[in-house]
Amino acid sequence: MLSVQLTDEQQAIVAHNEGPALVFAVAGAGKTTALVHRLERLVRERVFEPRKMLATSFSRMAVDDLRRALARWPHTQGVRVSTLHALGYRIVRKAASEGLLKLAEVKEEGAEQALLQRVLRRARELKVPWVAELENLEPEDFLSYVGACKGNLRYANLEEAALPSQALKVAAQAEAPKGLEWYLELYRLFEQVRREEGLLTFDDMPMQGWEVLVRYPDILQVVQKAFQAVLVDEFQDVNLAQSELLDLVTAPHRNYMAVGDDDQTIYEWRGASPRFILEFERRYQARKYLIRDTFRCPAPQVALAGRVIAQNQQREPKRLSLTKGFAGRVYVRLEPHPPAQAQSLASDIAGLLAQGHRPSEMVVLVRLYAQTPYLEQALIERQIPYQVVGSTPFYQRPEIQGLLAYLYLAQPGRLEGDSKRFWLQIYNTPKRYLSRALADAVWWRVEQGASLLDALRAEAAGAEERVAKRLIELADLFEWLGGMLERASAHALLEALEARLDYRRHLLRSSGFYEVGAGRAEGVRAFLEYARDKGSVADLLRHIGLLAQEHLGDPAQDPRERVSLMTIFRAKGLEWPLVFIPDCNQGTLPYSGSENLEEERRLFYVALTRSSAYTYLYALSSLPLSPFLQEAEYLEVLGAVERVGEALALPPDQLSTAQTLALARGAHKLGLERYLYRWWNAAQAPEVAAKVLRLFARAEQAGWLEALGLSSEARSLWEAFNVEPGQGPAGEFAGLERFLLRPSSPSKPPVFMPGQKVRHLQFGPGVVVDLEDGVATVEFADGVRRLALRYARLEVL
């Protein structure tokens, strides 16, 4: 066995033999190390045969990590390692081999698109009542709806499925999204065609695997015997189908270990729920373990993230425990408006690149892709290579291209080049219930030399009244646009066009997921704001063309390292040395369109725990700061971390009264007990503890414990070092009374003036340079900052 030093918490997991177990592992906890060492021990000690052990997860990345880690030991090679989807497929394949069902072909992830196109052709052939709706169908949106239904065991036609009675306790009839009732009918047709073709899609695998087990007891028995011990990683991400599948597989023995972090449950919109992991202990009478040590984040991130997530009520109480020390930083930048914020972020990245950091070490995490326009422009201007992971550059996104297509088509002159693509993009956006055949007929006239206006009116002349009315309305819209091109700014015209089309409302209504539709609508709102200072329509289109030219290549064609921009959803499970989080304001973090405040707080927690070194938070001073930062009292937390870190780095005889008090107060408040006992390992620890205890004794003697903010719990932390305080030098804590906490009073807030000396908890002493609308411009040693006075908590010196 390879020699790896495990913590006591990891060792407890490795030592677990049989029976149900639940492991809560914080971000960056090294849980994979504990899990594979448990598997290795169980094999080595012959508790289970390796081929009868299953290590699985929803996440392909987690499974790959497990597989790589297990490869170190020859005797663990027989352990079954697979995703939950692969487990479901294996069960279906077993049933097919027994002749219990037909399985002609398995389609991998992504093949659903081709199947959907065949389903749409069938719908048009059948002339279904909702056929006109198909012209505006967003394939990804519908397939996400289908995937969510299947993940939650929501059947297209539950009665037709004829499930056994016990299965009906968890399975249910699917419902259509509000305003998209025809989605359910299309789901039914989708399933009909899929079954006719004998296909199994990626989303079918867990659901169909579960269905096989509830239908066929013999198959259930075979599968249960095949897996005598099951370990599930990233359990917070499982959905109902996966949870119920695992419940059946492990029923005879419950040698079932679930590992995850409820604080990182951020995929509720697609079926994951914290209840699966939070209810696991009670459901299975499982033994509970905690892994609290984080090997990723330094002290500022640990303290701030821990304070943020502690506000959630629906969670397993636990605290991130520091191991890495105090080398990292969390910076908070307040900027007046989005362009300034983007320039500040790009400037920070450029400075770090100049210091030798690599682009691949950096990530910009956003709540919505709608946040990226100004960020992308600032990166392009500084020639910083970037990639938008999971999306495209903002000017290529369908919701933005949809608006721009109207402007391109309204340009004077003959329509050529991409004009047909623009036309096909907008003729039914928003819904006009015009057929593709009619759209082709209009464009045929354009290709023959007619203007788009003339082509629309010519087709209207021969159409039935309802269709003719819509064609004429569209012609009138383009006539209005053509007349406004030279008269209005791009911003004004786009705002008027969006209002006339009710475009954002259309985006919201045309999505089966509020999260998706709201993101697109927000993207349009952000783009309209982005266009505000871009001049005329011609100027805007030229600007976008230049952005496309200057954007440094396609990542698929250009191997250069890039800064990544991605949503927080995509960042879970990943880490970078340098993390940048813009728009830490109310309305974005948390997102104003979300009703689930606890999930929004979990999202912010995930973002805060991605960095292994430096985190940069940006907020607009013109908007309320994120309540997640306010309720966490971020300035006090970061200030306390800085003071404690400075004190721990000093020899005991150099600790001032203020620094000793910082240790006495801050170590317990920051939850540093485990760090100080297990990871600090300072040679001078006994002397430091003795000095802190002498301060407690001095405060107690003077009756100042409460007035100094010193608690019995804080004292116990230092008493655990088992040292005698001893006698310090005379006057060791002279001036301690200066640190007595004054009771708060209803006194007026300080009045600030230019030239005044002030102190900020993070940036230190500075001088007020300017004041405007509640925002102070202050010159600090490391540069000039603009700070919102209601949040900055400046102290007058």
Write out the residue ranges for each language-model feature:
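Conserved helicase core region in the C-terminal RecA-like lobe
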Residues: 80-90, 231-234, 259, 368, ...
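ATPase/helicase motor core of nucleic-acid motors
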Residues: 87, 283, 326-329, 357-487
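P-loop NTPase Walker
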Residues: 1-102, 221, 303-306, 609
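Conserved helicase NTPase motor core
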Residues: 3-15, 19-27, 62, 80, ...
